């Protein structure tokens, strides 16, 4: 496609006013409707706009709490992932014990090996299914966990502390 040599901005809310059934009726969408959109420019390719799109659609909400004796310094991350196209989609306490569950989603469509870095030692990593049933114990431990992800994979891991 050719690039426009002029700025293009068209903020139109598209909506359908006809039922999705082939013989469906027309209907009115009464009430107040609102939408938001974010505008930016980036180099060609979806990978260049992906971080902005994710950040725009998932704002970061901070809730300040009183420190109750935690030892993690304010300058450190709780968790780092080496690949920008691997999403941490879940982090929580395991249902059956006091260990940590993380769920990673590979967003780029490529098989890859990533590194998850934590500020504490992990004794063992166990791959689980979505309902935390243990599937496979991995030969991984320490503060840096090297994990393999398949293309478009959604993997859940139990981190034994």
Indicate where each model-derived feature is located.
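Terminal accessory/anchoring regions of large secretory-pathway or extracellular enzymes
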Residues: 1-161
């Amino acid at each position: 496609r050719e690039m426009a040599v002029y700025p293009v901005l068209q903020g139109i809310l598209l909506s359908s006013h006809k039922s999705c059934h082939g013989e469906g009726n027309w209907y009115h969408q009464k009430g107040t409707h609102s939408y938001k959109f974010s505008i930016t420019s980036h180099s060609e390719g979806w990978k260049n706009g992906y971080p902005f799109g994710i950040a725009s659609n998932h704002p970061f909400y901070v809730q300040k709490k009183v420190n109750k004796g935690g030892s993690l310094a304010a300058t450190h991350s709780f968790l780092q992932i080496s690949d920008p196209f691997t999403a941490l989609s879940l982090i929580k306490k395991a249902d059956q014990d006091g260990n940590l569950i993380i769920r990673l989603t590979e967003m780029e469509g490529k098989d890859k090996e990533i590194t998850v870095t934590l500020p504490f030692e992990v004794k063992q990593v166990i791959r689980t299914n979505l309902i935390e049933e243990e599937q496979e114990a991995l030969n991984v431990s320490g503060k840096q966990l090297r994990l393999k992800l398949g293309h478009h994979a959604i993997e859940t891991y139990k981190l034994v502390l």
